A protein has these predicted regions:
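Short, helix-capping/interhelical loops that line the mouth of catalytic, cofactor-
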Residues: 88, 92-119, 167-217, 276-284
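Short, contiguous alpha-helical
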Residues: 139-196, 218-221, 225, 235-284
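Tandem repeat scaffolds
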Residues: 18-96
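N-terminal amphipathic/basic-hydrophobic helices that include classical n-h-c signal peptides
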Residues: 1-29
C-alpha cells in the first residue's frame, strides 16, 4: 500500500541486514536512537509510554498495535496489507492515492511500449511544472526538509541515482553510470555509496543537480521512444548497483522502477512544496 515510501523503502525486493555493532546512540537532545538493530524483532511492548515514537526505514512485517490510544497516528510506507480496528483499509488507501495522483496507476500498470511512452510523457510534464513552481522560492527553501523528509534538491539527487542505477547501469550497462551527486536510499551504507563514486555530503544547487538529472531524463526519453516488446522482455546483464540482490533483472521491471520512483517522489515533493510556500504542515 502506498507505493514506494519517500526516501525510506529499499526498492523492489532489496533487503539489508539490520545487525550492527552500533545499534544504539543518543542525540544531543538525549532522545534515544536505535540504528540498524534487530533487538526489537518479535518484542512485546506493554504498558509503555510511546508518545512521539518515530520509526523510519524499518522492516515492520507483522507489526501489531493493539488496545493502544492516542490523538494522531501517522503511517507511511510500502505495505501489502493494513488493518485498522479490524477493517482492511488497504484498497481504500490505494484507490484514494490513485484518485489524487492518477499517474500512479499509469506507472504501476504500464505494460506495452506505448504505455511506457505515455507515462514518461506525463512524468516530464509534471516535473516541468513543479520545478517551475519551485524556482519561485528562495534557494534556501529548496534545501529545507519538511518533517524530516528529503529536500527538493535531495529528491532530485535521489531520482538521479535511481535512473543511473536502474537505467544507466542495469538496462544500458554504461561504463560510468553513477553521477557523484546521486543520492541513494537511506539504507545504503556510506562505504558502499563511496564505492559507487557517490558524494553524499555534496551540496549542489537546484540548477547544478538538474543538469545531470535532465540529461538522464533525456536518456530515458530516448529509451522509451525506441522501446519494443522484445526489449522490454530482455534480461539485463547487470543489477542496478552492487548492494542489490543477485537475481534476474528484466528491462520491463527496471524501467517500471524508474517510472514508479518518479511518480511517488513527485507526490512527496508537491506535498512538501505546499508547506514551503507557506501552507500548513500536514498533521502527523
Amino acid at each position: 500500500m502506498g507505493g514506494l515510501r519517500r526516501r525510506r523503502v529499499a526498492p523492489l525486493g532489496q533487503h539489508r541486514s539490520v545487525a550492527s555493532t552500533q545499534p544504539f546512540r543518543q542525540t544531543a537532545s538525549m532522545t534515544a536512537e536505535y540504528v540498524q538493530s534487530d533487538q526489537f524483532r518479535g518484542a512485546r511492548i506493554h504498558l509503555c509510554d510511546l508518545a512521539g515514537l518515530e520509526i523510519r526505514d524499518c522492516e515492520v512485517s507483522g507489526l501489531k498495535v493493539v488496545d493502544c490510544y492516542g490523538s494522531t497516528v501517522y503511517l507511511g510506507g510500502d505495505f501489502k496489507r493494513v488493518v485498522v480496528n479490524d477493517v482492511d483499509v488497504t484498497t481504500y488507501v490505494e484507490a484514494e492515492l490513485d484518485r489524487q495522483h492518477p499517474l500512479r496507476r499509469l506507472a504501476r500498470e504500464a505494460a506495452s511500449p506505448d504505455d511506457y511512452r505515455t507515462t514518461w510523457d506525463a512524468i516530464e510534464t509534471l516535473w516541468a511544472a513543479t520545478l517551475e513552481r519551485a524556482r519561485r522560492l528562495p534557494e534556501g527553501k529548496l534545501h529545507e526538509r519538511v518533517d524530516g523528509e528529503w529536500s527538493l534538491v535531495e529528491t532530485q539527487r535521489h531520482l538521479l541515482f535511481a535512473s543511473d542505477a536502474w537505467l544507466g547501469n542495469a538496462v544500458l550497462e554504461e561504463d560510468a553510470p553513477y553521477h557523484p551527486w546521486g543520492f541513494p536510499s537511506g539504507g545504503m551504507p556510506a562505504d558502499q555509496a563511496a564505492q559507487l563514486g557517490l558524494t553524499l555530503d555534496a551540496t549542489p544547487t537546484l540548477d547544478e543537480v538538474l543538469a545531470p538529472r535532465q540529461r538522464r531524463m533525456a536518456t530515458m526519453r530516448r529509451v522509451v521512444e525506441g522501446l519494443t516488446e522484445a526489449e522490454l522482455d530482455r534480461s539485463c546483464g547487470r543489477k542496478p548497483a552492487e548492494p542489490y540482490p543477485d537475481q534476474e533483472y528484466v528491462v520491463r521491471r527496471c524501467l517500471k522502477v524508474v517510472l514508479g520512483e518518479e511518480v511517488e517522489h513527485h507526490r512527496y515533493a508537491v506535498r512538501d512544496l505546499a508547506v514551503l510556500e507557506g501552507g500548513e504542515r500536514p498533521e502527523r
